[in-house]
Amino acid sequence: MSHSVIKVSASAMEQMKQSYAGSLTPAVPQGAVFQAKPPGCTITAYRSGKVLFQGKNAGTEAARWGTAEAPKAKKTVKKAADPLYAPPAGIASMSVIGSDEVGTGDYFGPITVACAYADKTKLSLMKELGVKDSKDLKDPQIIEIAKLLIKTIPYSLLVLKNEKYNQMQEKGMSQGKMKALLHNQAISNLLRKMNGVKPEAILIDQFAEPGIYFKHLSGRDIVKEKTFFSTKAESIHLSVAAASIIARYSFLIEMDKLSREAGMTIPKGAGPHVDEAAAKLIINKGEGALRTFTKLHFANTQKAKRLVERKRS
């Protein structure tokens, strides 16, 4: 049986737990934080930060969350990245469309997907504007840089709001397929905007193996030519870093809108503070409000309902 092991932060582990909310097992092995069994894979997350993926889809699931650690014995246990879709040498200095998403692990708020075209002649300017991995930037910096970027480079942005997200999820669509559809559409939109200008490459921040990504798009017009995938793609090309900044900027705007609508601050993430906020929203606006504010299938929904019951009893 194939397996992969990755190391993640506590916050990333919490996001993973929420993502697999529908397939969590009631009991967990000793030393584990959670165990989930999505199709073709058993996932066990340990307090040490290590996450073990086992089964025929181990490589696919592990690739959503990070790079697997090098195996100590058998070299065949980790699925190698498909060389056909690995970024080419020298891509950092090429003219590239980069694509990334924000909001997939947040209980409140939409998923925002952005792609941005960074012409090789603009790379120095983008560095001067402060473009880098968005994880290293605070929200005020994101806002400042994004406002400059959207006036400087071609981009495309899509926002999947909660009500539509919940409709798609309830019809059986996985979050992975939603993301694939959004990335493909955003890239298609940007290529049309560029009026015939051809990028040297298209780089997608990898959330699934390329074969799975393209399978999600079966039956649709797929942008495939010169398309490459990599985890941590923000550090490979500035176009992906720019896309991430624009996507996060949009996410912040949407969260502000939700906060105004709710009459309270809507928090990011999926931790206990989010459960409390969701419980407060239920008390103030009714349980039905969750449909337009949250990703209903996350475990936070049931946790918030239990909090409300305790507060009312």
From Swiss-Prot:
Matching CDD domains: RNase_HII_bacteria_HIII_like, RNAse_HIII_N
Its biological purpose: Endonuclease that specifically degrades the RNA of RNA-DNA hybrids.
Gene: rnhC
Species of provenance: Bacillus velezensis (strain DSM 23117 / BGSC 10A6 / LMG 26770 / FZB42)
Intracellular or extracellular location(s): Cytoplasm
Root EC class: hydrolase
Family recorded in the similarity comment: Belongs to the RNase HII family. RnhC subfamily.
Record's protein name: Ribonuclease HIII
Co-factor requirement: Mn(2+); Mg(2+)
Superkingdom field: Bacteria
Co-factor: note: Manganese or magnesium. Binds 1 divalent metal ion per monomer in the absence of substrate. May bind a second metal ion after substrate binding.
Catalytic reaction(s) noted: Endonucleolytic cleavage to 5'-phosphomonoester
